[in-house]
Amino acid sequence: MQIRAISPADHAALLDLWRRTPGLCVRAEDAYEPFCRYLARNPELSLLAEVDGQLAGCLLVGHDGRRGYLQHLVVDMPWRGRGLARALLDEALSRLAALGVRKSHVFVLRDAPVALAFWQAQRGWGERRDIQVFSTQGDAG
């Protein structure tokens, strides 16, 4: 397995992976231009795992200078159960720590049981019950 930084050239393959992954919701922000903006704003942080030259998994990683934000941690079905998700997560946290970012958040859809089970099993990660998340599309009047 090889882990490398995601590049804009990876977008089509990643979009295909995301679309066929249960529990992952592809949104307008996953289109090519927002994807490229995200990579440019967070250089060398988002990661792709390859096995024998094939896309096996990915993790989008960003930060605001204080907190890391992890999104779209996906391992393709044939590669699950081999430690790829944990390897991607470890590498992401290492890269964030090198930037001085030690605390990270991940948002997991409630109807994604595989993802929920993964995060619940990760040592050092805990579900926050003291906050609720509110979101906007930016067009609220």
Segments (PLM) and residue ranges:
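Short acidic, glycine/proline-enriched helix-loop-strand junctions
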Residues: 114-131
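Conserved beta-strand-loop-alpha-helix junction that forms the acyl-donor binding cleft
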Residues: 106-116
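Residue-level recognition of the GNAT/N-acetyltransferase active site
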Residues: 7, 76, 80, 109
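Extreme N-terminal starter segment of soluble prokaryotic enzymes
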Residues: 1-2
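Conserved GNAT acetyl-CoA-binding A-motif
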Residues: 96-108
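Acetyl-CoA-dependent GNAT
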Residues: 5-72, 89, 95, 99, ...
